Amino acid sequence: MIQATVPYFTFDGEATEALDFYKKVFQAEITQMHYFHETEGFSGDKKQGERILHARLAKDEKDLFYFSDTVEGETDAGNRLALAVNFSSEAEFVQAFVLLSKTGTVEIPIQNTF
């Protein structure tokens, strides 16, 4: 069963500003924030390290939006919005992933993240 579908915005260094803007607009709270420099083995420069790897904005305990920055210059203007589909079980997630993978392009393989 799908628990939620959440818009996931990707930016080229503007995720912090967008997160602050939507936090104010929707009177929401930041419930999760990770930066590139926090990842194991990070070897980028300080500017890249301060970019948002993943952030969650929620209201009334429900996720509104997810945010992230890319590595500088790697943002494709046509791919700035994705949908994160949250399943109630891992088995349902894997089943959907396998079926979608048959005709789609896997950008990120199944892995533990946030």
What are these regions (language model features)?
Residues 1, 11-12, 87:
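Alpha-helical interaction segments
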Residues 3, 51-53, 79-81:
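Residues that flank catalytic or metal-binding motifs in active/ligand-binding sites
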Residues 3-5, 63:
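Short, well-ordered coil/turn segments that N-cap beta-strands
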Residues 7-9, 83:
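A structural signal for short, well-ordered beta-strand segments
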Residues 9-62:
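Core segments of cupin and vicinal oxygen chelate
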Residues 59-63, 71-114:
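Vicinal oxygen chelate
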